[in-house]
């Protein structure tokens, strides 16, 4: 979905291994990690923040390597689910903030163009999530709906 950048984006490479790394010495079992994930989610942390907390405070490099399940799968198993996928939620938050800015500054044409690009990205992502089944087929992005979802969950 690289529509804007011509070059690559720097990032770290994830290790290609199935199990946990050999150097990992955890005091917790995979079920303890699952309970910790659920507890952090109930405190209001997003899945990406939970991953960062587990990495930085508990020394868990990747939840999937240790538990065998993705973090979002663990949350869904325990009945905790965001209304829309996390990346889409953050894009919607950005669009809501940009619309608020445009209400105060209607002549900001760079922001208008940014909003158009951002909403195009949201529509592409919605189309993808409908195709893979993460969103219902009749789900539609509207600025009003985005405002409600963002205010409820972020």
UniProtKB/Swiss-Prot annotation:
PROSITE patterns: RIBOSOMAL_S15
Any one cellular-component term (Gene Ontology): cytosolic small ribosomal subunit
GO molecular function: small ribosomal subunit rRNA binding; structural constituent of ribosome
SMART domains attached to this UniProt entry: Ribosomal_S13_N (SM01386), Ribosomal_S15 (SM01387)
Alphabetical list of CDD domains matching this protein: Ribosomal_S15p_S13e (cd00353)
Pfam families linked: Ribosomal_S13_N, Ribosomal_S15
Region (Disordered), start-end ranges: 1-23
SUPFAM superfamilies, per the entry: S15/NS1 RNA-binding domain
BP term (GO), one: translation
InterPro entries linked to this entry: Ribosomal_uS15, Ribosomal_uS15_arc_euk, Ribosomal_uS15_N, uS15_NS1_RNA-bd_sf
Subunit structure: Part of the 30S ribosomal subunit.
Family: Belongs to the universal ribosomal protein uS15 family.
HAMAP family (UniProt xref): Ribosomal_uS15_A
Protein name: Small ribosomal subunit protein uS15
Species name: Staphylothermus marinus (strain ATCC 43588 / DSM 3639 / JCM 9404 / F1)
Taxonomic classification: Archaea, Thermoproteota, Thermoprotei, Desulfurococcales, Desulfurococcaceae
């Amino acid at each position: 979905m690289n529509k804007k950048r011509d070059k690559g984006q720097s990032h770290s490479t994830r290790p290609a291994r199935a199990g946990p790394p050999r150097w990992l010495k955890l005091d917790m079992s995979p079920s303890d990690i699952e309970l910790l994930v659920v507890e952090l989610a109930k405190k209001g942390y997003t899945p990406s923040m939970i991953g960062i907390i587990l990495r930085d405070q508990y020394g868990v490099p990747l939840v999937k390597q240790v538990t065998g399940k993705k973090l979002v799968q663990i949350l869904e198993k325990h009945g905790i689910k965001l209304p829309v996928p996390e990346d889409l939620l953050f894009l919607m938050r950005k669009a809501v903030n940009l619309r608020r800015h445009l209400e105060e500054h209607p002549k900001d044409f760079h922001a208008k163009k940014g909003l158009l690009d951002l909403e195009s990205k949201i529509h592409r992502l919605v189309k993808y999530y409908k195709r893979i089944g993460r969103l219902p087929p009749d789900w539609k992005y509207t600025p009003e709906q985005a405002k409600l979802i963002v205010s409820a969950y972020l």
